[in-house]
UniProtKB/Swiss-Prot annotation:
It comes from Ralstonia pickettii (strain 12J). GO terms for molecular function: protein-lysine N-methyltransferase activity. PANTHER family: ELECTRON TRANSFER FLAVOPROTEIN BETA SUBUNIT LYSINE METHYLTRANSFERASE. This is Ribosomal protein L11 methyltransferase. The keyword Chloroplast does not apply. The gene is prmA. One of its GO terms (cellular component) is cytosol.
Length: 298
């Protein structure tokens, strides 16, 4: 069976209404995506702590409608636009989509990810590419990160170059646990991952177990106390600014702090939030994102 995929780029205020109209008029499925995803202009889905939540959709939204083979995309788009009084008609593209074994197709699209010198993130259906590699087995599709985003890669590259054996390490905002797990595999000592999302904590525990890593993952109120030799936080700029005092307090004198999830244009203001306690500099930049690092004075 063949389907048709119709992709429309629309303004934020029209995305939800157009999606509902397309679905009401016979689309098999409709999704809304950030047209600027994976660029420096991407927007957090639900906003950042301390900022107004994102509205119903992104500034530039992409509406993707899956249609039956015999559907007429032009008529459907025109009818949907008319239903919500949208003028002029949005630009759209259409492509044919063959029915396939989607599990196999998805797996074929994800190859092992090489990060730094010897780190590989490997889906469960692949073997490790190098016998001496530092391998993390993580499957794509996790909501909490698999190493493909520039900020995650930057943090992993930093860890590969700078982790010292036995260092007590904290991954704050651990998501999938990927940074805590790689730190442990690189020789870190006691390793703790913290996240405000219980699902992320559970995902991290699962990933640590499948990677044969001993680490503690917990919600903030349940996390081990004390200071750490190494604190890494790959979150977003505004929560990083809001949590500056707390994160600095978690770093022991002489310990190191690594931050990412920060756009190049945000680096100066994020560093300013930490300047009174830990001076931060840009370690490396990639694709509009930066990794900041610094040492807490003794």
């Amino acid at each position: 069976m063949t389907y048709r995929e119709c992709v429309l780029e629309v303004a934020r205020d029209d995305a939800e209404a157009l999606s509902e109209a397309l679905f009401d008029l016979g689309a098999l499925s409709v999704s809304v995506e950030d047209a600027d995803a994976d660029t420096p202009e991407e927007q957090p889905l639900f906003g950042e702590p301390g900022h107004e939540p994102t509205r119903l959709a992104w500034n530039r939204s992409r509406v993707v409608a899956l249609l039956a083979e015999d559907a007429d995309p032009a008529l459907l788009v025109a009818a949907a636009a008319n239903e919500i009084n949208l003028s002029p008609l949005p630009a759209y593209t259409v492509r044919e989509v063959e029915e396939q074994d989607w599990v196999r197709v998805t797996q074929s699209q994800f190859e092992p990810i090489h990060i730094g010198e010897h780190i590989w993130v490997v889906p469960s259906w692949h073997d490790a590419p190098e016998p001496d590699a530092v391998v993390l087995e993580l499957d794509p599709g996790l909501a909490f990160g698999t190493g493909s985003h520039p900020t995650t890669r930057l943090c992993m590259e930093w860890l590969e170059q700078h982790v010292h054996p036995g260092e007590r390490t904290l991954d704050y905002g651990c998501g999938s646990g990927i940074l805590a797990i790689v730190a442990k595999k690189l020789g870190a000592g006691e390793t703790v991952g913290v996240d405000i999302d219980p699902n992320a904590v559970e995902a991290s525990r699962y990933n640590a177990e499948r990677n044969h890593v001993e680490a503690t993952f917990a919600l903030p109120d349940d996390a081990p106390e004390g200071t750490f030799d190494l604190v890494v936080a790959n979150i977003l700029s505004n929560p990083l600014k809001l949590m500056a005092a707390m994160l600095c307090a978690r770093v022991r004198p002489g310990g190191r702090l690594i931050l990412s999830g920060v756009l190049e244009r945000q680096a100066e203001e994020v560093a300013a939030a930490y300047a009174s306690t830990i001076p931060l500099t840009v370690w490396r930049a990639r694709d509009g994102w930066v990794c900041l690092h610094g040492v807490k004075p003794t």
